[in-house]
């Protein structure tokens, strides 16, 4: 069941989103060649706590880290590791959640470590752009499937693979709530968008095939062709007019 949030609930989610956004900004400055994904995870945890929040992903479904940190062909759900060291040219996805006074925010960013090819730069930029294409249709009266249509129509012109096995979701007191939000076109329109619905929209775009698999650690999702993937996500709220992003500052 899709819940409609009160104004008070939305303000708490906005507070959670501010903490998460500031943490993402701090992580962007922290990333450099030679550090491990474990280093990033501990830095993220420390930053979230310093800002007054809690890391939502820690032990969520028994996930062992604070943030999901995925490198290169890893799409999502990468487990932070002391042995996974960043190198020049890596593409790293940071996906995290923050809980503040019982309410959640969820956002992901993709960073390039140092310099890389224009091909990878374009993938990262276009993944982010696809989120903002989706944001344009997040108005009352439209349907959930309009989000997938917007992402697909934008991404298909570049020939990338849109991950279908993992999707966006509603969010509120829980990280994952109804409705499910595919990043691709489905046969069903899905629920109607209404004022004060809160959604986590998160296109996951692969340079090559859309096909993915889960690694032996039972968490990390990787591309089947070994090519890089990019991920961009924000928590938003539907309003009477334009939607608002709750996870930026």
Segments (PLM) and residue ranges:
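Active-site neighborhoods and metal-handling regions in enzymes and metal-associated proteins
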Residues: 1-249
């Amino acid at each position: 069941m899709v819940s409609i949030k009160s104004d008070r609930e939305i303000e708490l989610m906005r507070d959670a989103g501010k903490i998460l956004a500031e943490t993402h900004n701090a992580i962007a400055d922290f990333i450099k060649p030679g550090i491990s994904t474990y280093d990033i995870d501990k830095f993220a945890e420390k930053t979230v706590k310093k800002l007054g929040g809690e890391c939502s992903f820690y032990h969520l479904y028994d996930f062992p880290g604070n943030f999901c940190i995925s490198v290169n062909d890893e799409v999502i759900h990468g487990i932070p590791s002391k042995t996974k060291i960043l190198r020049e040219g890596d593409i790293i996805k940071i996906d995290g959640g923050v809980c503040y006074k019982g309410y959640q925010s969820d956002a992901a960013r993709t960073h390039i470590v140092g310099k890389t090819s224009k091909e990878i730069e374009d993938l990262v930029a276009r993944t982010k752009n696809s989120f903002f294409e989706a944001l344009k249709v997040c108005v009352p009266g439209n349907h959930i499937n309009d989000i997938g249509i917007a992402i697909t129509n934008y991404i298909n012109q570049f020939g990338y693979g849109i991950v279908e096995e993992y999707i966006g979701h509603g969010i509120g007191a829980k990280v994952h709530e109804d409705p499910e939000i595919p990043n691709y076109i489905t046969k069903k329109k899905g629920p109607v968008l209404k004022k004060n619905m809160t959604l986590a929209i998160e296109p996951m775009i692969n340079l090559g095939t859309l096909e993915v698999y889960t690694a032996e650690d039972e968490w990390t999702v990787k591309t089947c062709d070994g090519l890089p993937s990019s991920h961009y996500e924000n928590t938003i709220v539907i309003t009477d007019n334009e939607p608002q992003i709750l996870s930026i500052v």
